[in-house]
Amino acid sequence: MSTAVNTIRCSLLLLGLVGIYTVWISSFRNGLFLRNEEFAGKGQLPGTPNATLRTHFTGIDTLDKALGIFVVFYWPVCQGNLRSLSLIAFPAAVGVGEMWILFALQFSQSNSPTRAMGKMAMFGMGLMLVGPGIFLPIYCSLDLSSTHRLDDSPSSAAEGHLCRNLRSCLLGGYYILVILLALPSPAVVSYGSKQGIIALLQGWPLLVSAMLWLTHLCGKDRTADFQATLSTARTSIYISAMACATISHLVPLLISLLADSSDICPGKVFVPHLAWPSRRVTSVEEGLLRFFQWDYGLGSLALLLWAVGLHIQRRQQISQGINYLRLIPEALFLSVMMSPCGAAALYLYRHNSTNCASKTGDKSGSG
């Protein structure tokens, strides 16, 4: 493994340690988690005094209590009481979906659909339960040492079927639920229904994986040249991931830049607050703003470093040089213009194109 890739792996591990402090430890020290537990214990929802917390979701007491805590935690995000929180929550929600689907493409390279979908489900639950700011840097660091072995694995019709259904299943099992959360309450969606949607979202990776499994069981691949359709499916996913990440990044950024209010200036929305031990939050909304700034920021940066690492790794495997003086400023520029998630999708698209060109060259040479 090259020095550059090793440096990226070490940087990812360092990001994971930073995430443990800024996302978890800091949230304990600044009072966010304590306030969350207080609201859950009283059966109240922060910022909505006329609504009560649901106590029944699944009928299993332990699971219902855990889901109630998650509902209280995410409730201010979908109510829009703090505009800066809404602006950072939009790219964060889209970013989590794009993080998942970009890794799902890597998992689908396994010849076993069951194994691939199992990895998708576990990876997604890791994102939800641990948080992308902690889970993703550590996972990406470990993954860089093994993912390259999948690049030359033979494609299968099952892999093509998974890739063609990834986007539609993610839309139905995740993004539609996120859109429903953005609808006003109680005018359009009742308080109880919105709490149920938040609870359901905690297991969206399992839901999306189950939808993929059903499409795999019910669908039959009638395409003779699945290699061509697989390449098309991958390309469309990378392009849509770039588009979604870029739009969700630029829209809040432009709103923040053009707004007259200093409360939603870019520095207060997108720049993480320093996690000083003595700095307490005055509300759950303020604590969530800090939480998402660090969690989404570190997670998206880890995704970009992982994608760049794969790009470097593959180019070195096929004996192509890397111009680091060009690569570093290019990655920084793309991060500003497209978001780190969008830039990661672009580098993964280049990585996939390099793999396809390499395989085509190998087949031509062997023919």
Swiss-Prot record:
Transmembrane segments: 8-28, 57-77, 85-105, 120-140, 169-189, 197-217, 239-259, 292-312, 327-347
Superkingdom of the organism of origin: Eukaryota
Pathway connected to this protein: Secondary metabolite biosynthesis; terpenoid biosynthesis; Mycotoxin biosynthesis
GO BP terms: terpenoid biosynthetic process
Residues of this chain annotated as glycosylated in UniProt: N50, N352
Entry's localization field: Membrane
Protein topology in the membrane: Multi-pass membrane protein
EC number: 5.4.99.-
Annotated Gene Ontology cellular component terms: membrane
GO MF, one example: isomerase activity
Keywords: Glycoprotein, Isomerase, Membrane, Transmembrane, Transmembrane helix
Function: Terpene cyclase; part of the gene cluster that mediates the biosynthesis of the neurotoxin verrucosidin, a methylated alpha-pyrone polyketide that inhibits oxidative phosphorylation in mitochondria and thereby causes neurological diseases. The carbon backbone of verrucosidin is synthesized by the HR-PKS verA, and further modified by the other verrucodidin cluster enzymes.
Annotated family: Belongs to the membrane-bound ascI terpene cyclase family.
Protein name (record): Terpene cyclase verU1
Species this protein is from: Penicillium polonicum
Gene behind this protein: verU1
